[in-house]
């Protein structure tokens, strides 16, 4: 049976993703053909985010998004042993995370991501680099939302003001990019004014 969400996941994988079969031994890089066989895999490109990913560490994580009035994830990838899950939201338009990316859309995406993380009660320590690989038979996968999300569509069901309060986690997800920019730009402006790099 054809699974459009899984096909989309595979199409959007990096050419050489990080992967692991056992996170205790770290991650490695290989071609997509090898990495796609592993239990864990890098799901976003190095400089573009096609998916918002969340790690929810509680029993029933794959279904309690509904009880929390959160938008339906595109995919849930559940550990059958403990019920913990990764929830992935497919974006219609990728978010440019490279150094040349524009800050305004990045800040908006970070606010949406943080608000959704809070609504889902997702792990703030999750780096978002790799996820449970939905291609691997160890995990249970479910497709909930077949349509691709826009940030505005996600934002419609979230309180972005609450997401930008004192609880915002500066080193979580896209917030890392914004924090890095804010911390380095002041130094860079001063350095350029003082004639750096000459």
Regions found by a protein language model. Give the residues of each.
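Short secondary-structure transition/capping segments
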Residues: 119-131, 167-172
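Generic surface-pattern signal
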Residues: 70, 117-125, 189, 193
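Short, conserved secondary-structure transition motifs
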Residues: 90, 124-152
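Modules that initiate DNA replication and primer synthesis
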Residues: 91-95, 151-198
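Generic detector of well-ordered alpha-helical segments enriched in charged/polar residues
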Residues: 63, 110-113, 117, 181-189
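Helical (often loop-to-helix) elements that flank the catalytic cores of nucleotide-handling enzymes
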Residues: 93-123, 153, 157-164
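Signature for HUH/AEP ssDNA processing cores
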Residues: 1-85, 91-107, 126
